[in-house]
């Protein structure tokens, strides 16, 4: 999990990442994200909406096993982050790392 956290941080710093559930859903409706990450404690209603639009857009959803506060910490933010959309992972290998983790059965949606 430390590798995924390191990759999330690098993607936030060097890539194009949008934080927040409302923005994530808007981008999913447009089919723009390459990956969506949701915190384990993301409210069920929001998570269901994200999963619905992600399925329509054929975008993988990774469930981060920590809380939204933990995800905010990893992103370097002093607030909760229930979900985030990755448009470009920059210098990180976040998308490949998460896909590999999901194939191995680590917290897939």
UniProtKB/Swiss-Prot annotation:
A Gene Ontology cellular-component term: cytosolic large ribosomal subunit
InterPro entries: Ribosomal_eL30, Ribosomal_eL30-like, Ribosomal_eL30-like_sf, Ribosomal_eL30_CS, Ribosomal_eL8/eL30/eS12/Gad45
GO BP, one annotated term: translation
Entry GO MF terms: RNA binding; structural constituent of ribosome
Pfam family, one: Ribosomal_L7Ae
Keywords noted in UniProt: Ribonucleoprotein, Ribosomal protein
Tree of life domain: Archaea
Family listed: Belongs to the eukaryotic ribosomal protein eL30 family.
HAMAP family, per database record: Ribosomal_eL30
NCBIfam families referenced in this protein's UniProt entry, alphabetically: PRK01018.1
Protein name as it appears in the record: Large ribosomal subunit protein eL30
Organism listed in the record: Methanopyrus kandleri (strain AV19 / DSM 6324 / JCM 9639 / NBRC 100938)
């Amino acid at each position: 999990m430390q590798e995924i956290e390191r990759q999330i941080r690098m993607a936030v710093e060097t890539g194009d990442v949008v934080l927040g559930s409302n923005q994530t859903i808007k981008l999913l409706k447009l089919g723009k994200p390459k990956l969506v990450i949701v915190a384990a404690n993301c409210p069920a209603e929001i998570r269901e909406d994200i999963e619905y639009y992600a399925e329509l857009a054929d975008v993988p959803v990774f469930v981060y096993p920590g809380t939204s506060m933990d995800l905010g910490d990893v992103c370097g933010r002093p607030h909760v982050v229930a979900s985030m959309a990755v448009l470009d992972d920059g210098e990180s290998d976040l998308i490949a790392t998460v896909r590999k983790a999901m194939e191995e059965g680590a917290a897939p949606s």
